[in-house]
Amino acid sequence: TGFDLELAEAVCKLEGWELVKKPLNWDSKDMELNSGSIDCIWNGFTMNGREDDYTFSTPYVDNSQVIVVAEKSGIDTLEDLAGKTVGVQAASAALDLLKSEEEGGQKKLADTFGALNEFADYNTAFTELQAGALDALAIDVGVANYQIKSRGDGYKILDETLNTEQYAIGFKKGNQELCDVVNADLKKLTEDGTVAKLAEKYEIADMVTLK
């Protein structure tokens, strides 16, 4: 994504490195990394479930799918959603997840709901949640944080997530040295406001976890 590339450019600038952008055949990424023809994988690369295969930077984006409920709903776990009416945005990652029967999919959970209602946008869905027409919302964590922040108290995100998806920079397993340099640079770029500026430019401020 543009965010990844501009952040990579900013790190290279700090180090006096030349950024070489290399399109990857996804199947040969490990070969390229291990042979040294690339130094890292930096493009919306999900670290969860891959921790044993790469040395990862600090995660910089959280794209997990979560459940939002009214604070006083009495809903605390995913199991509590049985028989409830759950809202989700049409054509969203959360909806895909709730329909998926593949490993990591949550169709079994969705089958316990009383109803799964699709909405064109989250503003409408939150209005329905507020009115009590919905018991819960399935939504990505960035949007959830933004909506809750802008609407004030009265909502909570369940501790149990539908899935966990954090993006990090993947280095060859054991290449801690390069990873440490990049982590230190990410910290500098966070402190000087570069990360926040880029996050705003690409409209992902609520997903970026570098603070």
Question: At which residue positions do the language-model features occur?
Answer:
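Flexible hinge/capping segments at coil-to-helix
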Residues: 69-86
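Extracytoplasmic small-molecule ligand-binding "clamshell" domains
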Residues: 1-44, 201
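Periplasmic-binding protein-like
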Residues: 62-69, 94-97, 141, 145, 149-202, ...
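Alpha-to-beta junction loops
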Residues: 16-18, 34-43, 84-87, 121, ...
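Ligand-binding cleft/hinge of the Venus flytrap
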Residues: 8-17, 94-118, 148-152
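Short helix-initiation/N-cap motifs at beta->coil->alpha
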Residues: 20-31, 73, 112-127, 165
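A ligand-binding cleft/hinge motif common to bilobed small-molecule-binding domains
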Residues: 28, 44-53, 97-100, 128-164
